[in-house]
Regions:
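An amphipathic alpha-helical core segment
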Residues: 141-180
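Conserved small/polar residues in nucleotide/adenosyl-binding loops
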Residues: 181-186
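Mid-length scaffold segments of soluble, non-membrane domains
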Residues: 80-81, 85-150
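N-terminal membrane-targeting segments
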Residues: 1-20
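N-terminal post-signal-peptidase region of extra-cytosolic proteins
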Residues: 22-40, 57-85, 105-124, 173-177
């Protein structure tokens, strides 16, 4: 079966989900999307990019590789949080997946961050979950192998694992910003 690539890109267009974009004052449309698909846990936006999508999570990371936010089959899939992460983003390391696509669809704009000026001009984004906006500050850019166990360790438990994670970023980032990290109180 041949797929028309335009159909794939149309399915991946963030404009398909504009009616569901939540704000703290208006979440009704977002709640409607959650009724369509209860796996919708939030929304991710990277300021001044085309990354502006519902965020999903299920107990199987393969599900949203080819399923959209409304639960329909789609080659472009959806943006989703690793199944091992807590949906309240309280883990030390939260991993969000999505296809890197052409035409600035899904995580297609991530490639732009490899340009230093673009990285410097796009430091912020937003995660909407639990009915609130939670700002994101992007502090480093790395290109890593998908099998890098330090970076893709969903829940580093020990202070040594957390230290190794941070050192891996500091030592291997293409670009980075100063960021003050304080360990949460036990």
């Amino acid at each position: 079966m041949l797929w028309d690539s335009n159909q794939v890109y149309q399915a991946a267009d963030a404009k398909n989900y504009e009616t569901y974009i939540p704000t703290e004052k208006h979440i009704k449309s977002f709640e409607e999307l959650q009724k369509i698909n209860p796996d919708v846990i939030g929304w991710i936006r990277v300021n001044d990019t085309n990354i502006n999508y519902p965020l999903l999570q299920t107990d199987d990371d393969d599900t949203y590789m080819n399923t959209d936010a409304e639960g329909k089959y789609s080659l472009s899939g959806a943006i989703f949080l690793h199944c091992g992460n807590k949906p309240d983003f309280s883990d030390f390391n939260n991993i969000i997946y999505g296809h890197h696509m052409e035409k600035h669809m899904m995580f297609g704009d991530i490639g732009e961050f490899t340009k230093e000026q673009y990285f410097n001009e796009h430091p912020y984004g937003n995660l909407f979950f639990d009915g609130k906006n939670h700002g994101i500050e992007f502090y480093a850019l790395m290109q890593v192998d998908a099998y890098n166990e330090t970076i893709f360790n969903v829940c580093p438990d020990t202070s040594e694992e957390k230290q190794a994670y941070l050192l891996e970023i500091i030592d291997n980032a293409l670009y980075k910003r100063c960021l003050l990290y304080t360990s949460p109180s036990p």
